[in-house]
């Protein structure tokens, strides 16, 4: 047994180290003071440093790392199969390969927990701002949905459109403005005043669409990344959402709220439109569940251009409802729940509670 342990000593030590980090994280995550010290004293400054370094490059380092990881995984799979075939002691060889794979997996889990998972247990936007979601009264929901529909109608006439009346603003211009979108919130929420690094468009955006993702924040590089293939009318609000993650805010509900607030207050027409549109979509979905007649009344008040954009967005995503989307969204849901958010992916839509509480 000792000889067997010594034979795989490095892999076993690697395993124990990762296990120790994960156990320690599980024990300390209930301590708000410990998580605040980790996030605001170590990981957030570190991610901002990563982000500054990667911002100098014209491509997404996160996307490059994903590609390299996929290629490396394929090469390692071939090498391990060859190793197993050639090995005389196939049981020990299989154990060594399995141990190596487990070590790599736990390393990613441990690093991700430290760089990102800790944010779920540290002070968040609601803790710092004093705002908090509360039960929504029907009358307030209807009032705020009508308000957003009215502002959305006004904003729709301020953006570029193509010959079919669809939103047609330049995507690169939207990305270029992103690092200024939060300037309008610093007076009300000074703790949000952190350096911004503009989101980067993903080259393999169709793969993101197949997984039902419009954007993601990558803590290993401090980069915000956005889908450049999905309809452009919500690209600006996606940028703002991912920039909220850059500030160490993990809650999807809070990031959606901040994205809507920043977009609707900034001085860029494309961001105005995207902010009111994103807010309207979530509010109207909630109103539809509460009162379909009222939902129809509000929807009928929208101009034809907005309705065309909504249909375009729905038609695009209806093409990506297959097994890949269900699988990746299920994984995302489980990941969010594993860090203590009982809503999982439903937390994106829970922004309604914050919006109604703020605007009612």
Which residues make up each language-model segment?
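Post-HExxH zinc-binding segment in Zn-dependent metallohydrolases
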Residues: 139-143, 148, 250-294
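Pan-zinc metallopeptidase signature
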Residues: 305-360
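Membrane-interface segments at or immediately adjacent to transmembrane helices
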Residues: 117-187
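Auxiliary, metal-adjacent structural segments of Zn-dependent hydrolase domains
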Residues: 160-228, 232
């Amino acid at each position: 047994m000792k000889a067997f342990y010594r034979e795989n000593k490095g892999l076993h030590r690697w395993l124990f180290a990762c296990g120790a980090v994960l156990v320690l994280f599980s024990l300390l995550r209930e301590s708000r003071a410990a998580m605040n010290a980790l996030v605001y004293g170590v990981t957030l400054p570190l991610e901002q440093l990563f982000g500054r370094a990667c911002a100098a490059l014209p491509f997404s380092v996160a996307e490059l790392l994903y590609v390299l990881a996929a290629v490396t995984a394929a090469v390692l799979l071939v090498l391990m199969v060859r190793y197993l075939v050639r090995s005389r002691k196939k049981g020990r060889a299989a154990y060594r390969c399995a141990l190596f794979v487990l070590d790599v997996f736990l390393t990613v889990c441990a690093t991700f927990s430290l760089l990102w998972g800790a944010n779920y247990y540290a002070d968040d936007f609601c803790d710092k701002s004093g705002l908090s979601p509360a039960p929504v009264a029907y009358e307030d929901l209807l009032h705020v949905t009508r308000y957003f529909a009215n502002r959305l109608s006004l904003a729709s006439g301020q953006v570029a459109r193509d010959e079919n009346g669809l939103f047609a603003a330049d995507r690169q211009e939207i990305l270029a403005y992103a690092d200024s979108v939060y300037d309008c919130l610093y007076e009300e929420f000074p703790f949000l005043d952190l350096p911004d690094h503009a989101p980067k468009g993903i080259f393999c955006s169709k793969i993101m669409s197949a997984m039902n993702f419009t954007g993601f924040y990558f803590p290993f590089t401090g980069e915000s990344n956005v889908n450049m293939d999905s309809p452009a009318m919500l690209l600006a609000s996606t940028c703002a959402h991912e920039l909220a993650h850059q500030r160490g805010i993990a809650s999807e509900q809070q990031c959606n709220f901040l994205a809507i607030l920043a977009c609707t207050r900034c001085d860029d027409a494309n961001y105005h439109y995207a902010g009111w549109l994103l807010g309207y979509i979530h509010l109207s979905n909630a109103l539809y569940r509460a009162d379909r007649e009222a939902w129809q009344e509000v929807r009928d008040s929208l101009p034809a251009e907005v309705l065309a954009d909504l249909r375009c967005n729905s038609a695009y995503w209806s093409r990506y409802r297959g097994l890949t989307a269900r699988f990746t969204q299920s994984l995302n849901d489980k990941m969010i729940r594993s860090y203590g958010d009982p809503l999982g992916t439903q937390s994106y839509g829970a922004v309604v509670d914050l919006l109604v509480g703020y605007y009612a």
